[in-house]
């Protein structure tokens, strides 16, 4: 049975790549299946999806929440037009199901499908859903959750904990640095744009890590802003580090790492739990609804990660946590096992199974 599927949303990698994972699983099962993405011109989807060979249609839509009165009002005025755009795209493509993965395009596309009597689903990556998914959850046929905590926002009849879909290529990474002897590898990153607070704290941590200097192998994704200053800081302190603004092959970077130091976005959490890595999580405190802190708390509660709130982040505290992991390998292994117990490497497959069953009804 071949199917036609629209995947709506994007804007950021955290929304887009779960959709890509679902699309790739659909095509893995049957190359005759057809997938169309619906996004916006401001998101990363235009470049990413072109490189991956997926078709994309664009909506003229913007976010509403947290954008000020004037911009929110203008965004509201665009909603009827984006709904009509979505209906035309749906009429032309004739999908069997429309899946919203979060981001500005998800709302009008999924709602248009619902109004046209087409099967619908949403994937919620965070433990606290955003406004759009809370609204869509009342109308869609299925809600796929990354965290069980998110279930309280949706009907139990619709919601299922699937985990956050990860692309199959993520599990095929080759280490970016080969380890020898007692070397301890750190992967430091703050999302695709880096994180200045993490970069600054790690720079401050270097004097406190001098005793481990010969043992540490560090890969640090800084973002463009801090790349030169961080490279200079490592050099001045005598550390061996690979400092880059952006890591294209995160799978390889994860594979080489003993310990991760990162934000607590939904994609990072999904990757950490899918492959079972110990992590020091530093949630971005200004995320809508503080959802990164809530994401981190899920792992913290399970003993699957350490969390340092950004307001408490210092170089000394960060260095102390790193030294503790280095000195206690059993702690590292235990945390890896607990992280892996929370993940689902079959999330994309489970979501496709559910959608196929829904289409047959």
Swiss-Prot record:
CDD domains: GT28_MurG. It is found in: Cell inner membrane. It is an enzyme of class 2 (transferase). Keywords: Cell cycle, Cell division, Cell inner membrane, Cell membrane, Cell shape, Cell wall biogenesis/degradation, Glycosyltransferase, Membrane, Peptidoglycan synthesis, Transferase. UDP-N-acetyl-alpha-D-glucosamine binds at residues 12-14, 126, 167, 192, 247, 292. It is a peripheral membrane protein. NCBIfam families: murG. Belongs to the glycosyltransferase 28 family. MurG subfamily. This is UDP-N-acetylglucosamine--N-acetylmuramyl-(pentapeptide) pyrophosphoryl-undecaprenol N-acetylglucosamine transferase. The gene is murG.
């Amino acid at each position: 049975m071949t199917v036609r599927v629209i995947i709506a949303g994007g804007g950021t990698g955290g929304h887009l790549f779960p959709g890509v994972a679902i699309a790739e699983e659909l095509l893995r099962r049957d190359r005759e299946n057809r997938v169309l993405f619906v996004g916006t011109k401001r998101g990363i989807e235009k470049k990413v999806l072109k490189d991956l060979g997926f078709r994309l249609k664009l909506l003229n839509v913007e976010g509403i929440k947290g954008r000020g009165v004037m911009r929110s009002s203008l965004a509201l005025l665009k909603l009827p037009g984006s709904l009509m755009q979505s209906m035309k795209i749906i009429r032309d493509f004739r999908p069997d199901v429309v899946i919203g993965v979060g981001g500005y395009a998800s709302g009008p596309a999924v709602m248009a499908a619902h109004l046209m009597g087409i099967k619908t689903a949403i994937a919620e990556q965070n433990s606290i859903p955003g406004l759009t998914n809370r609204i869509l959850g009342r109308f869609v046929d299925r809600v796929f959750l990354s965290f069980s905590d998110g279930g309280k926002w949706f009907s139990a009849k619709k919601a299922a904990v699937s985990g956050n879909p990860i692309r199959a290529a993520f599990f095929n990474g080759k280490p970016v640095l080969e380890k020898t002897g007692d070397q301890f590898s750190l992967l430091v990153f703050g999302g695709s744009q880096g994180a200045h607070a993490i970069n600054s704290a790690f720079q401050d941590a270097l004097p406190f890590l001098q005793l481990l200097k010969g043992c540490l192998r560090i890969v640090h994704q800084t973002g463009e802003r801090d790349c030169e200053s961080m490279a200079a800081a490592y050099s001045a302190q005598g550390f061996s580090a690979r400092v880059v603004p952006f890591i294209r092959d995160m799978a390889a970077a994860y594979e080489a790492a003993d310990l991760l130091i990162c934000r607590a976005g939904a994609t990072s959490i999904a990757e950490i739990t899918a492959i079972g890595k110990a992590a020091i999580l530093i949630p971005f405190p200004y995320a809508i609804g503080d959802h990164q802190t809530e994401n981190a708390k899920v792992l913290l509660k399970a003993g699957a990660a350490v969390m340092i709130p950004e307001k408490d982040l210092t170089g000394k505290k960060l260095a102390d946590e790193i030294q503790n992991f280095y000195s206690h390998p059993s702690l590292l292994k235990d945390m890896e096992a607990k992280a892996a117990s929370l993940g689902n490497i079959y999330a994309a497959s489970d979501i496709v199974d559910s959608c196929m069953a829904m289409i047959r009804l």
